[in-house]
Amino acid sequence: MGKPRQNPSTLVSTLCEAEPKGKLWVNGYAGTQGTRDATLQTRLIPLSFHLQRGKGLAAPLSALSAPRLPERPADGRVAVDAQPAARSMDSDSGEQSEGEPVTAAGPDVFSSKSLALQAQKKILSKIASKTVANMLIDDTSSEIFDELYKVTKEHTHNKKEAHKIMKDLIKVAIKIGILYRNNQFSQEELVIVEKFRKKLNQTAMTIVSFYEVEYTFDRNVLSNLLHECKDLVHELVQRHLTPRTHGRINHVFNHFADVEFLSTLYSLDGDCRPNLKRICEGINKLLDEKVL
């Protein structure tokens, strides 16, 4: 007679000192792997388990696009491939099309919050971590992203391209957040993190200053600051992420640093002025809260 079945509501975590060879055998569970420094961290999660977040329930794991489990061998064990999580995190297999966003409200409604949740669920399907589960884009940042989408759509006259730019921005931000929160950056890279924070803070204050003080706007100054931020991001993730993600970084920063886009955004009598006002209000809030 076989062993009694384990309670599926429990969470089992196994820490292995070294990466296992070949297959990792798990009784009746689907396994996902995460790495922290040189240690392989394997979290075994029942498919019915729900990730808990500070103020409520996050998306259930059963809603994620989980890979099909292999057939159970004669001894009743399930085989799960043991692969490094850093590489899995940067994989985009099974990704939705790059078309316009589709939400419950209809295809013309853009929500950066919804897009961020989709991206996180995709990454969470490859890495099981409570830290990652709690990493949701805050409401203020979400509101800023929504306004950036609107002005990008206004400038490009292309909803599909505007959506793709914001999708790339959110993906890059989440991936960097995962690396940082899971202590994947070396001491040298942490120095780059501090440089990037200072440069981002300088850029944020410049964006607000150019809006609040009329006739001070200089599109070349702001463009150069954004390109400097881009270079620091490339340097930071050089050994962690794939060329595809580096392409996303270029796609995002090259758009927002484009002098023609900046001129449209800061035009005193342009249609984007109300959006710029809300963007700067959000940035000011993040500055006051020491987020930027």
Curated annotation (Swiss-Prot):
Signal sequence annotation: none
UniProt keyword list: Cell membrane, Cytoplasm, Lipid transport, Membrane, Transport
Subcellular location: Cytoplasm; Cell membrane
InterPro entries: TNFAIP8-like, TNFAIP8_sf
Region spans: Binding to phosphoinositides: 109-292
Tissues in which the protein is found: Widely expressed (at protein level). Highly expressed in most carcinoma cell lines.
GO biological process: 1-phosphatidyl-1D-myo-inositol 4,5-bisphosphate metabolic process; phospholipid metabolic process; phospholipid transport; positive regulation of ERK1 and ERK2 cascade; regulation of apoptotic process
Domain of life: Eukaryota
Gene Ontology CC: one annotated term: cytosol
Annotated stretches, region: Disordered: 81-107
Function: Acts as a lipid transfer protein. Preferentially captures and shuttles two lipid second messengers, i.e., phosphatidylinositol 4,5- bisphosphate and phosphatidylinositol 3,4,5-trisphosphate and increases their levels in the plasma membrane. Additionally, may also function as a lipid-presenting protein to enhance the activity of the PI3K-AKT and MEK-ERK pathways. May act as a regulator of tumorigenesis through its activation of phospholipid signaling.
Protein family: Belongs to the TNFAIP8 family.
Protein name: Tumor necrosis factor alpha-induced protein 8-like protein 3
